[in-house]
Amino acid sequence: MLKSASQNFFRAYSSRIGRYAATASGKLAQSRLSNIPTPKALKKFLDEYIVGQEIGKKVLSVAVYNHYLRINDKQKKGELQRQRELMEREKIADDRDEPIFSGNSESKAGWRNLQRQFNLAGREVDEDLELSKSNVLVVGPSGSGKTLLATTLAKILNVPIAITDCTQLTQAGYIGEDVEVCIERLLVNAEFDVARAEKGIIVLDEIDKLAKPAASIGTKDVSGEGVQQSLLKIIEGHKVEITVKRPVKHDIDGQKNQTTTKKDEVFVVDTSNILFMIMGAFVGLDKHIVKRIEDMKKIQKAGESVESSNSKEVEKERAKKFRFSNTLEQVELDNGKKVCALDLTTPTDLVSFGLIPELIGRVPIITALQPLQRDDLFHILKEPKNALLDQYEYIFKQFGVRLCVTQKALKKVAQFALKEGTGARGLRGIMERLLLNVNYDCPGSNIAYVLIDEATVDSLQETEHSLASQVDVKYYSGDEKDSLIRDVSEEDKKLGVMLEKELGHSANIHTPTIPKRSLT
């Protein structure tokens, strides 16, 4: 009878503990590596939206992958520890309730077996090893795609992201925004879900504007080194208490008519698992790097340091030479290969630029983006998902107009943007000026087709910035498809063939060519 009772108890006990082990195993499985896109998958997704920047995309893909791998590992260890404690409490409770069986060899063997099963669920977890946090610093000229890289990664990972302009940050007590505003924005973008916000991405843009001045000029530095110091605790990973005005809806009449007010609410956010991406153009950093490398070569060659007076003269001449240049300086390596100077950025260079060593120490991954060339800008116009040309074609389609832009015209636009030195961000401005009056006149008219060719872009470059109304454009009515196809084919045969298939007309049909007309 005693043996039978012991067996019944053990079966019930085993079943209960088994459920805990299964629960632990299931929860651990939810955080497995398979849920994180691989670096190759991340880069492939970035390739769909971003042209060029191969090295930058690879560095960020690996950094993001390892960051969320670290989060998963931390979650596994936490869940494993909680389940282990739960099992221990259950065993103690059962031993207390049924002390007669506590020394039963069968129970002890069963417990050891269940404990082995539980430990098997976490066999890949090294509980003594803690993975360090690796934030990222991205250096690159304006318009090179820094912010787009971050927002695209957040999209594929389905995590909230908040972008903060560091030029607006000041020390606590001064007019401006406190550093905690970046966490507040992330929390808002996470719809006030603290757990989700704690796995998000914070982008600190224009971090170079926080560089501490080289020398004090008798004024209080409220947005430089002091702000950098304030950012240290947040970036490293601490629990931060913030007060946020959270919208609250009120039913005012019981008939689904609601009003919204804002109520102060306190949240505690742990920044340990938030990925910080620090970005900036760092204008002039390339010149500093070139100077550093030149000085090193001279020291190695002559065996003595460069005179400070000579260094100052070289720096002055270099500043004059590159003051109005949109390109970055290059460095020739010992093997004869030339690389962009920013590719050789070191933590020491960033400290010399004006960032404090403590901040640089919390951002171990540094990568540089290249200035975009004409071919890059050309491909950006038409190739990525959400390409600029696709957007404008879609807009014109909404009011019944087919927008046709030739390849030569796109190359001219790319060259124009390169000349202005505004990078990819400048492409939209040029397209807006190019299509301003076309967009104004076409809706509600009998115009069915618009052709933007090389001559159209040339006419834009010949006008003043504010006189984009003088751009030469070709217009076609609905029954002038053949004229459109013929004019397009003269400059872009591939587009002409595509239009012929799309519109169902032959370009060989001879119809009067519609004259060029300017929008005035």
Swiss-Prot record:
The lineage of its organism: Eukaryota, Fungi, Dikarya, Ascomycota, Saccharomycotina. The keyword Nucleotide-binding applies. This is ATP-dependent clpX-like chaperone, mitochondrial. ATP binds at G140, P141, S142, G143, S144, G145, K146, T147. It comes from Saccharomyces cerevisiae (strain ATCC 204508 / S288c) (Baker's yeast). Changing Y174A: Abrogates unfolding activity of unfoldase. Mildly increased ATPase activity. Reduces ALA synthesis. Homohexamer that forms a ring structure; this hexamerization requires ATP binding. Interacts with HEM1. GO terms for molecular function: ATP binding; ATP hydrolysis activity. The gene is MCX1. PANTHER family: ATP-DEPENDENT CLP PROTEASE ATP-BINDING SUBUNIT CLPX-LIKE, MITOCHONDRIAL (PTHR48102:SF7), ATP-DEPENDENT CLP PROTEASE ATP-BINDING SUBUNIT CLPX-LIKE, MITOCHONDRIAL-RELATED (PTHR48102). The keyword Transcription does not apply. It is found in: Mitochondrion inner membrane. SMART domains: AAA, ClpB_D2-small. Changing E206Q: Blocks ATP hydrolysis. SUPFAM superfamilies: P-loop containing nucleoside triphosphate hydrolases. Disruption phenotype: 5-fold reduced production of the first heme precursor 5-aminolevulinic acid (ALA) and 2-fold reduction in total heme. In combination with a disruption of HEM25 or an inactivated HEM1, abrogates mitochondrial respiration.
